[in-house]
Amino acid sequence: MTFHKISGVPATMAALLFLAGCAVGPDFQAPPPPDVTGFTPEPLTKPTGAADTVGGAAQYFNAGQDIPGQWWALFHAPALDRLVTQALAANPDIKAAQAALRQARELALAQGGAYYPSVDASFSTSRQRTSGAQQGQSGTSSIYSVATSSLSVSYDLDVFGATQRSVESAEAEAEYQRFQLEATALTLSSNVVNAALQDASLRGQIEATREIIEAQSEQLDVVRRQFTLGGVSQADVLAQESTLAQTRATLPPLEKQLALQRNLLTALAGRFPSQEVAETFSLASIDLPQDLPVSLPSQLVRNRPDVQAAEATLHQANAQLGVAIANQFPKFTLSAGWGSAADGVDGLFGSAASGLWSLSAGITQPIFHGGTLEHQRRAAEAGLDKSAAQYQSTVLSAFRDVADALRALQADAETLKAQLAAERSAGASLELSRRQFAAGAISYLTLLNAERTYQQSRISLVLAQAARYTDTVALFQALGGGWWNRTDDTANDTLRK
């Protein structure tokens, strides 16, 4: 076969190469931050209320202050720091998110290979026997060998940006996985801290319940002695026994909850239940952060991993629309080949070999596909609208989370103040009731009511103390957790690339 030089091919190639890289479809623009000046209707200028008890310190809101990367260190609890570090290093959810990010990045790099020509080499050798009868001739058959080698190059010109948009989509997916990793790390660290606080709260409730049981047991001994002396009726003894039994019945559920909480802490640290973590907690050993950094509303959309992930999804949908539009335009292909053929491998690269080469350019224009391409474009537009709405919903949820946390901090500070007053009042009332009962001034039923009130107030006080801590965790989590200030290597360099 004879190949003739086509003088127009180089000019055509130059023109197509010049056009390559022009991408159809909308270029992505990150949504601007919401035009709001605060998280709540009124400015946060006042500190929270304070109470003279564990977790009762006043907290101050510092607008515009950045959140530290290891925000849990603000609680000044070394055991808590160790547990969070263990969890971030060993939890399988983190490892899965890291692997998903690596996978997405490799797929994006693989997609980027379409920017370059494809070069392939081939080699074949065969030995054949033919008969003259196959050619309509008489005679004996002939045996011969054929060896060929070739090098082929093909290149799809990205004239309308289908490749560019596909790579853009893959890179946006990698960004999505990056922020999914950040969200996983934030959720994990928050869950560990909250689980530790729940551990401390349950231990406080158990301690209070045991103290109440001890006091009620002592009171039962007193009542029994009085019954022996004829000072009280048997009904009073039975009433005290019933009260003590009811209080004792509240202890096993608390101990069960503590055991389950220990299992949760162990699992979060990436361990099996039989490998229980050594760290234990009490509210008294954990400081309540008094200076609370509150980032500016304009920064929240950049700081929240879930908002950034939603933006990456929006970016991906935007790129997919570009791909769908580009698929409706012509596709241009350049290809070239060079090779040789000989009657044996030994002669393949010698003077006896026959040279082979080819050079071609092609264009494919979609004409009719049953409406597939048009519907794919419309589907991509709908997907972009969906992602935009989901992004807006994520932003609204982010601002609501911050507002909820701020409200909870203020309200629960007042609750603790009131609960402390209630506990102290109930304690004083119980002491007075015991003295009055001993003096015969009140009925035993009045004393029992005072005991029940004090028991409830002790447990409620511990719960109110724990709420101050969990509200603080909720604020740090709602503001994004300071991942941009992280210095640890939990996710190596994958967290910030």
What are these regions (language model features)?
Residues 19-21:
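C-terminal motif of bacterial Sec signal peptides marking the signal peptidase cleavage site
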Residues 60-62, 66-75, 85, 124-152, ...:
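Small/polar, glycine/serine/threonine/aspartate-rich low-complexity segments that form flexible
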Residues 60-61, 65, 73, 88-91, ...:
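Amphipathic alpha-helical coiled-coil scaffold segments and their short linker/junction regions
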Residues 1-12:
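Bacterial N-terminal signal peptides that target proteins for export
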Residues 263, 273, 288, 460-497:
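Acidic, low-complexity, intrinsically disordered peripheral segments
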Residues 23-108, 285-315, 366-367, 392-395, ...:
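Bacterial Sec-pathway N-terminal export signals of envelope proteins
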Residues 163, 179-296, 408, 412, ...:
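Periplasmic alpha-helical coiled-coil/stalk elements that build and connect Gram-negative outer-membrane
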Residues 96, 112-113, 157-185, 235, ...:
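Sec/SRP-type N-terminal targeting helices
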